Amino acid sequence: NARDGKGVELLHDVLIKTVFLTSENSKIAKARARKVKADHCYINIKRKDMMLSTICKRFKVKPSNIAYIGDDVNDIKIMKLVGLSAVPANGTQEAKSVSDFKCKTKGGNGAFREFSDLILSSKK
């Protein structure tokens, strides 16, 4: 979604790093991360919560300063560990139950942009 890509760009404009973290092992995910110029892309990650310390070390950030958007049960553990979590409108009920912010838009249809706008508004 072009709006999601613009969300990444707007975050980069204020020096906020973006990371793709997916359980998929697909060239499509990597290509999308490259296209929107994400700072890093981790693919084929089954235990996303186990990657948190790696991400924190790589970008010199605390978990409490990380915002994360996820849509399914494999996102729940990491959502509980970060400072701000969100779920798209079409996320699972389990993910919605632990998220700090529920997007009005669906994943792939602007949910990331909606979340990035929330993050950007908090920086003003």
How would you label these PLM feature ranges?
Residues N1-R47:
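Alpha-helical substrate-recognition element adjacent to the catalytic core
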Residues N1, K35, C41-Y42, D49-K124:
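Mg2+-dependent phosphoryl-transfer enzymes with acidic/Ser/Thr/Gly-rich catalytic loops
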